[in-house]
Regions:
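Active-site nucleophile elbow and catalytic-triad environment of alpha/beta-hydrolase enzymes
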Residues: 100, 112-128
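Short, conserved loop/helix-junction motifs that constitute active-site signature segments
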Residues: 129-132, 157-159
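Catalytic active-site module of serine/aspartate enzymes centered on a nucleophile-bearing elbow/loop
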Residues: 152-155, 161-196
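Alpha/beta-hydrolase-fold enzymes
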Residues: 17-102
Length: 196
């Protein structure tokens, strides 16, 4: 994800300082759909800053982000659909989860820092052909932010040998957080090769 973008940028800028590159759920540039969602998030946070509601706006923006990190299938398995009859603002089960994630996020992230981080993702551009070191690429077939086609395009455009692994996963973009064992099984042999 973000670390993958940093790794790609580092490999492109400093080719002599890197021997191997492991990229999880990242591409040479942002996907248009992800950029659109992040732009909405930045507008929400900006509106909050202008109206003395920055923390609530940041929480809402994070909730929106969570919908892009996870799959609709996972949410349908975990939460009941719909809201109560009494109040149009009554939360759904999924909404309560998103609210909790937003509250946790705003405890560790300032609105200004979020705006800078979000914009940096949408400014990310790397000339993948300039990266010649061996690269391991790992992605999820269900990822909405870095769809499989983007991982395949990165695989095809990197200038060195690559190994692409696209996994079926319920967790979408958050695969790397939720499937640590599977990530380790792919990363360990690749990293061990480099240590020899």
């Amino acid at each position: 994800s973000y670390g993958g973008m940093v790794g790609l940028a580092f490999a492109a800028l400093f080719p002599g300082r890197i021997d191997r590159l492991a990229i999880i759920s990242a591409a040479a540039e942002p996907h248009a759909a992800g950029t659109a969602v992040r732009e909405l998030q930045r507008r929400i946070v900006s509106l909050g800053l202008r109206n003395n509601a920055a923390n609530e706006a940041l929480s809402i923006a994070r909730g929106l982000a969570m919908l892009t990190y996870r799959t609709s299938e996972e949410l349908a398995r975990r939460f009941a659909p719909g809201i109560g009859l009494e109040d149009p603002l009554s939360p759904s089960e999924a909404g309560e989860y998103l609210r909790a994630r937003g509250e946790a996020f705003r405890a560790v992230m300032s609105p200004e820092r979020f705006l800078s981080l979000s914009a940096s993702i949408d400014r990310h551009r790397v000339d993948a052909q300039s990266i010649a070191c061996p690269a391991l690429l790992i992605g999820a077939n269900s990822d909405q932010l870095v769809p499989p086609a983007q991982m395949q395009a990165l695989d095809a455009s990197l200038g060195g040998p690559t190994s692409l692994h696209l996994r079926d996963c319920l967790y979408g973009h958050d695969m790397f957080l939720k499937e640590a064992k599977a990530m380790g099984e792919l990363l360990q042999p690749f990293l061990a090769e480099g240590a020899q």
